[in-house]
A protein has these predicted regions:
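Non-catalytic nucleic-acid-binding interfaces of large nucleic-acid enzymes and RNP effectors
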Residues: 1-632, 638-766, 781-789, 804-808, ...
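C-terminal, well-structured subdomains that either form a transmembrane helix-short loop-helix hairpin
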Residues: 765, 769-774, 778, 787-802
Length: 860
């Protein structure tokens, strides 16, 4: 195999050097695969140790095989017990009422999950009595949950009859809390409080009754669950026997060794198929199959998280153009930016706090007011006491809980960021000083996705700044201009990245002293840390490249498309007004669709403020281009009202509208809801044709799903990549008990398409598929012209010395993509595939697509 790889892929090095590189790559992939396997096994063992082994996927699959028959057995046993209790063994009779009081589905899931979890934790045998008691305790908790839900229904009915809206909302919030309970002690306390408030007494079963109920279910499981050995003989999966060598009679629950071996094998197999992916020290092998490409040893699918329906479509269609596009993306070789790496190491290792890196110490936790009288190890017991529960419901207690939750959330984020930094350092160590490659594959809608996790152009600002092209290209005078644009775009403050190109080029002249000082000593001259927080490291890398001629030959320069989703929508519908706003034509200046949307929104807000509207008055000084950016960009993706509210609230949070626990304040959400209601009308004023096309897609999807119950799919233009939207009402059947969550896969033939979710996703998925197609066309044409190229959605990157030529390619491929009527092509595909009458296509605009070829701000 190694000789075949060397002979088939190596082009520039000697055989011995190539063999050394391939051996290094195989060792690297094996190490990463082993690391991923070890992490998967450790995670599974931790779940088993906690008694949650039944939640692991191999255990769930085994339960799914038995569940249907076992549920029928329990249902029949309960039916007999109700009609003729004398037929139930006297030993189990005390627990009869507890099993009858819960549904057979819940009782079955509780018994099977508990038994499998216990035998996985104790393979040599688990206490029978303890297991039965645990099952009985969980059944008692389920009975209490049922009682609380019944009381809440009665309370809601009384409030509805009395017209008490506040009471209805309180009951709804309480119902949500009840559904989220995961601790039987909390359930018991809540049920006791609720029944006491209603003047009732909570009915609870004694320990003997609970144990007998659990024992009855264990007996039913023993009689029902069998496994088939290799010699085709059937044996019981569980057995109960007296513990050997003990004088006192003690029963033990055992699992069949073949069953435990099967579970262990499943856990190891699941851990083995999720390896981590390293960089490549040799050029990635070409994709030749949907499951083989990108790596020498590691096997990953060409589409991330493809479902069964999508995999079937991939197998049915010609993927040769798709393979060629991904191979073109995998073509560029990189090297580490040593100066950026050294700066990072110094700041990370020698400084505790730095604005461009996550702090290495957790923030100080909020002080617990009763810490002097409640020891830390007694807090959870005190919290359940009457005194603790009363204090936590008070204003002071509620505020402290909000602060504590915000602190925990912040600590988790910081831990994830620190882990990312460590993994990035590890990847940089693997890269060393030699050339390396970054393999890519596709997301389900056809967008590019790097297979390496931390060191790639889609990861953090720091990771992107660490990447240099391995091949040198002289920038020349033309390239120096694009390097100046890179500096202005990465600085980002004072609107430099939004100014006309001629002004952005002058950024270097106005900031030359700062650029040279930062490039000479970034640790002493830290002005670069004050730039746009999203691109600080890239600005530092651009300063170093401007100052160092050798680095300039390898440094990347990037251009961004102007709201690329709207560009595709405007081109597809030939909407001239929207095309002008997103720079599909040369108007003599850089158009700003976010600014135009903000101006229209501000007019509406000012009109409301003039009428004395509360939120209109508060929002007059807040509406600007930055506030409207996300809602405008995502409108053609089918963003919902709730999504717009979250987007506006996030921006207001950055402006000081925060709650004590972190996150947007309630006032920020009210103001955001006020603004979000106006955005659809604002976007319709900007470009009606593109909005009509989105509505046509949504209406067509509704008709198709309601008439055929088939997933929505199409082939992307030119490339022919099959896209499938697998939005299902139930991919798995969820059975929720107070302690367990059991997931069982629904057979493909029984799957029901989720119409609402698909309608919401169609606009975004179709636009992203066009975005991914444009990216692959760019990559293939750049490869044909020997230009190193990488992309991050609508951000295109290459050497500064080749950027002028590459920009022309980006515009040409965009025109080539939209040359035909993509609306008609989509309608024809759907009509032919689903045999459904679709609504008529909306009227097309008059945009001249060739204007893109002369627009300087199409990608800038």
């Amino acid at each position: 195999m190694l000789k075949e790889l060397i002979g088939g892929l190596d082009r520039s090095t000697g055989t011995s050097e190539a063999e050394s590189l391939y051996n290094k790559q195989i060792a690297l992939e094996s190490r990463y695969a082993g690391r991923g396997f070890a992490d998967g096994i450790a995670e599974a063992q931790e779940n088993i140790r906690k008694g949650k082994g039944g939640r692991l996927r191999p255990a769930e699959r085994m339960i799914a095989l038995w569940f249907g028959e076992m549920e029928s057995v329990v249902r029949q046993a309960v039916k007999i017990a109700k009609s003729d209790p004398d037929k139930v063994s006297a030993h189990y009779a005390p627990g009869l009422a507890l099993v009858v009081g819960t549904s057979p589905k819940i009782a079955t899931a509780t018994a099977m999950m508990t038994m499998i979890s216990r035998v996985m934790r104790d393979p040599s045998g688990s206490s029978y009595t303890s297991c039965a008691t645990e099952i009985g305790n969980l059944l008692q908790a389920e009975a209490e949950v049922i009682a609380m839900r019944k009381l809440l229904r009665q309370r809601t009915k009384r409030c509805r009859e009395a017209g008490d809206l506040a009471g209805i909302r309180r009951a709804s919030r309480t119902r949500k809390k009840v559904n989220e309970f995961g601790d039987r002690h909390l359930i018991h306390k809540a049920a006791a409080n609720m029944t006491a408030a209603e003047g009732m007494i909570l009915e609870t079963r004694g320990k003997i009754e609970r144990t007998r109920a659990g024992a009855w279910l264990i007996e039913l499981v023993k009689q029902t669950c069998i496994i088939v050995k290799q010699d085709k003989t059937e044996v019981d999966a569980f057995r109960v026997a007296k513990e050997p060598g003990v004088k006192k009679r003690r029963l033990v629950l055992y699992a069949h060794p073949d069953m435990l071996a099967h579970l262990d094998k499943g856990i190891k197999a699941r851990a083995a198929i999720r390896p981590r992916c390293p960089i490549m020290v040799v050029q990635p092998p070409s994709w030749a199959d949907t499951q083989a490409g990108g790596y020498l040893v590691i096997r990953k699918g060409i589409v991330a998280n493809a479902g069964p329906m999508h995999k079937a479509e991939l197998a049915r269609h010609d993927m040769s153009r798709t393979y060629a596009g991904i191979d073109a993306m995998n073509r560029p070789a990189y090297r580490m930016n040593g100066r950026i790496l050294d700066t990072f190491k110094h700041l990370w290792c020698d400084e505790q706090s730095c604005p461009v890196l996550p702090p290495q110490e957790d923030p100080i936790a909020p002080t617990f007011p009763h810490a002097d009288i409640v020891p830390k190890d007694k807090y959870y017991r005190w919290k359940r006491s009457e005194e603790g529960a009363t204090w936590l419901k008070s204003v002071e207690g509620s505020r402290w809980r909000m602060l504590w939750r915000g602190h925990i959330s912040k600590v988790r984020e910081l831990k994830a960021d620190r882990k990312g930094m460590v993994m990035l350092m590890s990847a940089a160590k693997d890269a060393g000083t030699s050339a390396f490659w970054i393999p890519n594959r596709l997301q389900c809608q056809g967008r590019q996705q790097p297979m390496t996790q931390h060191l790639n152009g889609h990861a953090t600002d720091l990771a992107e700044a660490m990447l240099l092209f391995d091949r040198p290209v002289e920038p020349g005078e033309d390239g120096r201009e694009f390097m100046a644009l890179q500096l202005a775009n990465a600085w980002g403050l004072d609107g430099w990245d939004k100014r006309p190109l001629a002004q952005r080029v002058r950024f270097v002249d106005e900031h030359r002293q700062m650029i040279e000082a930062v490039a000479r000593d970034p640790l002493k001259n830290r002005e670069w840390m004050m730039g746009d927080k999203k691109t600080r490291w890239q600005f530092l890398a651009a300063c170093m490249a401007w100052h160092d001629p050798e680095m300039a030959r390898h440094a990347p320069s990037s251009v961004d498309c102007s709201c690329n989703g709207l560009q595709h929508s405007a081109a597809m519908s030939r909407d001239e007004n929207l095309g002008r706003l997103v720079n599909l034509m040369d108007t003599g200046r850089r158009e700003n669709v976010h600014g135009d949307a903000a101006a229209l929104l501000l007019k509406r807000v000012q009109a409301d403020a003039a009428r004395g509207d509360k939120w209109g008055t508060q929002m007059v000084g807040q509406v600007d281009s930055n506030l409207c950016k996300q809602p405008v960009m995502t409108h053609t993706y089918g963003v919902t009202h709730r999504g717009r509210v979250e987007q506006f609230a996030g921006k207001l949070e950055d402006r000081g509208w925060t709650s004590p626990s972190g996150g947007p304040s309630p006032e920020a959400y009210w103001a955001s809801s006020y603004l979000a209601k106006m955005m659809p009308d604002v976007m319709n004023d900007l470009g009606r044709s593109a909005m009509d096309m989105m509505l046509w897609q949504q209406e067509s999807v509704k008709r198709i799903i309601r008439q055929t119950n088939q997933p929505i799919g199409w082939l992307t233009p030119i490339i022919g990549f099959p896209v499938v939207i697998e939005k299902l009402q139930e991919k798995t059947r969820q059975i929720r008990t107070c302690e367990h969550r059991l997931s069982m896969f629904v057979p493909v033939e029984d799957m029901v398409i989720d119409c609402d979710a698909t309608v919401t996703a169609i606009a975004a998925m179709h636009t992203h598929s066009l975005d991914g197609t444009h990216n692959m066309l760019n990559a293939m044409e750049c490869a044909r012209r020997d230009i190193d190229y990488r992309s991050k959605h609508d951000q295109f990157t290459t050497h500064s010395g080749r950027m002028r030529e590459a920009k022309k390619i980006f515009a040409e491929q965009f025109v080539e993509l939209h040359k035909s009527d993509l609306r008609l092509d989509l309608a024809n595909q759907w009509t032919e595939r689903y045999k459904v009458d679709l609504p008529p296509l909306p009227e097309r605009g008059t945009l001249d697509l060739n204007a893109v070829l002369t627009s300087p701000y199409f990608a800038s």
